[in-house]
Amino acid sequence: MSVTMREMLEAGVHFGHQTRFWNPKMAPFIFGHRNKIHIINLEKSLPMFQDAQKFVKQLASNGGTILMVGTKRQAREMVAAEAQRAGVPFVDQRWLGGMLTNFKTVKTSIKRLKEMKAQQEAGLEAMSKKEQLMFVRELEKLEKDIGGIQDMNSLPDAIFVIDVGFHKIAVAEAKKLGIPLVGVVDSNHNPEGIDYVIPGNDDSAKAVQLYAQGIADAILEGRAAALTDVVKAASGESGDEFVEVEESAA
């Protein structure tokens, strides 16, 4: 789970946006500028990323669900891959307005998606060619829009977002519902309202990979820790029972 300063440096996490596009509220996290590009202070970014990982790890160990969001072209594939590795829901194509605030309707669409997938597996021979074409088109659209959250049965316990400005609707919905936000915030965006800010480059593919992998690792470590605790508790109970049997036998 541990990420080093060198790894952040090599991934280009420190490269912000052009100075003329900066958000003054990011000033505490900016080291300076070079060639009219803001340089983000990695001495701030590293511990803040580690804090975000600790939060996610604890949440996962308690059985919480983290929704990973990254719909920008350079983030889609990585976010989907890391979310699947960690076994958590994700949004990698586009954020549908109301995905959180109107989750009841979204659940209806999820039900429809699952029914259609089952129908496809059973066979579409009874349909005409035209009906099959329309069916497949609808299924592909649903899969693209909500495929990543089809196993999310309730609202997530936290949301991880790469580029809070690009995903402002997702951020607004989470804030409205009081869902904790873990967000990568570049020099041109506002960090206010983000519970766990990760100051850093939100455009570099290498940086995006580092964030997504780090959060996925934290989720997996949290689950593993919880499982270890369960095993320890179970073995402790069986040990007590064994001692009692020994005593009664004596």
UniProtKB/Swiss-Prot annotation:
GO terms for cellular component: cytosolic small ribosomal subunit. Gene3D superfamilies: Glucose-6-phosphate isomerase like protein, domain 1, Helix hairpin bin. One of its GO terms (molecular function) is structural constituent of ribosome. Keywords: Ribonucleoprotein, Ribosomal protein. The keyword DNA damage does not apply. PROSITE patterns: RIBOSOMAL_S2_1. It comes from the Bacteria. InterPro entries: Ribosomal_uS2, Ribosomal_uS2_bac/mit/plastid, Ribosomal_uS2_CS, Ribosomal_uS2_flav_dom_sf. GO terms for biological process: translation. Belongs to the universal ribosomal protein uS2 family. This is Small ribosomal subunit protein uS2. It comes from Delftia acidovorans (strain DSM 14801 / SPH-1).
